[in-house]
A protein has these predicted regions:
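Short, flexible/disordered intra-domain loops and linkers
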Residues: 86, 115, 119, 224-238, ...
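Alpha/beta-hydrolase
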Residues: 68, 74, 194, 261-264
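Serine-hydrolase catalytic machinery in alpha/beta-hydrolase-like enzymes
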Residues: 44-46, 51-54, 59, 66-145, ...
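The feature captures the conserved acid-bearing segment of alpha/beta-hydrolase catalytic domains
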Residues: 178-252
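C-terminal catalytic histidine-bearing segment of alpha/beta-hydrolase fold enzymes
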Residues: 246-299
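Primarily recognizes the serine-hydrolase "nucleophile elbow" in alpha/beta-hydrolase
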Residues: 132-207
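Alpha/beta-hydrolase-fold catalytic nucleophile elbow
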Residues: 107, 153, 192-195, 214-215, ...
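N-terminal cap/lid segment of alpha/beta-hydrolase-fold proteins
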Residues: 2-66
């Protein structure tokens, strides 16, 4: 009996190999830029702690392809917590590698003085780190990554970074950015925005990158529409969640598929005990289908 034909990048077909703990950059760490809002002592004691930033790279074994799509996954944690080994990030990366992707889960710099300046600086530092991770992955290697098929996704803070990569790379960086020279021969084809936000809807005018978005309509941390992250005006101006982002993207002619969810919590893919939820699998399969459709249209 003939086996059914495999649907490219939708049906698992490969064993997965992992290269763990790959150092992709060396950066000054916690509060490396200092903070005008914090005590002088904290700036002296805590700034410029050197960090080796690491990623875990997942790849299909025995695929034989000379050209693989890349998925860059970024964890959440309010720019304070989290790491590349979070169960959801690992599960997503393993699944996408089994489909034929190279998938990388990255660590990035964390921590900020609790102020608007502090959070903005933490976001900028983390975005610079994500840039560095992309530069590393797209550099000379045996990973066989196709620079025309790059995808970025993340949860919460990681989704903010994914949106920043897709849209800020094509526009102007905020001041003091240290964006690497990535060149012009690559493209982010689509973003998985899992309960993230943008600070300014005008950033969506910088590019034309499709967005797949999931978020609870009653998210207690990131506003579904417009509001204050963590419901704390002291650390941020108002931001725009997935509904506002998708509405503006659609008005600009950008494909945006929004999946509002009824759960009364922020993190949808894992429960309080750290176990994957049924929603994780829904997101995983929706993301695979969304990305595959973009590849069929050549991004």
């Amino acid at each position: 009996m003939t086996e059914p034909a495999r649907i490219p990048y939708l049906t698992p077909a490969f064993e997965v190999g992992v290269e763990a703990g790959v150092v992709y950059a060396e950066k000054d760490g916690y509060w490396s830029q200092g903070s005008s809002a914090g005590p002088q002592l904290s700036q002296v004691a805590l700034m410029r702690h050197p960090l080796s930033l690491k990623m875990d790279i997942y790849f299909p074994e025995g695929d034989g392809s000379e050209s693989r799509p890349l998925l860059l996954m970024m964890h959440g944690g309010s720019f304070l917590f989290g790491n590349r080994e979070e169960a959801g990030q690992v599960a997503w990366c393993r699944h996408f590698a089994s489909l034929g992707y190279v998938a990388a889960s990255i660590d990035y710099r964390l921590g900020f003085w609790p102020s608007r300046h502090g959070l903005l600086q933490a976001e900028q530092d983390a975005l610079d780190d994500a840039d560095s991770a992309l530069a590393y992955l797209l550099g000379p290697s045996d990973l066989r990554i196709d620079p025309a098929r790059v995808f970025a996704a993340g949860t919460s803070a990681g989704a903010i970074l994914a949106l920043g990569l897709a849209y800020s790379l094509y526009g102007e960086r905020p001041p003091k950015g240290s964006r690497p020279r990535l060149g012009t021969d690559f493209r982010i084809c689509a973003v998985g925005d899992l309960w993230g936000y943008v600070r300014d809807l005008s950033v969506l005018e910088n590019a034309h990158v499709p967005i797949l978005a999931f978020q609870s309509e009653q998210d207690p941390v990131v506003p579904f529409d417009r509001g204050y992250p963590m419901q704390a005006r002291v650390v941020s101006d108002a931001v725009y969640g997935t509904r506002a982002t998708c509405e503006r993207a659609t008005a600009l002619g950008i494909r945006c598929a929004l999946h509002p969810c009824p759960e009364k919590r922020h993190r949808l893919h894992m429960d309080k005990e750290g176990r994957l939820t049924p929603r994780y699998y829904e997101i995983r399969d929706a993301m695979a289908a969304f990305f595959a459709e973009e590849m069929r249209s050549l991004c």
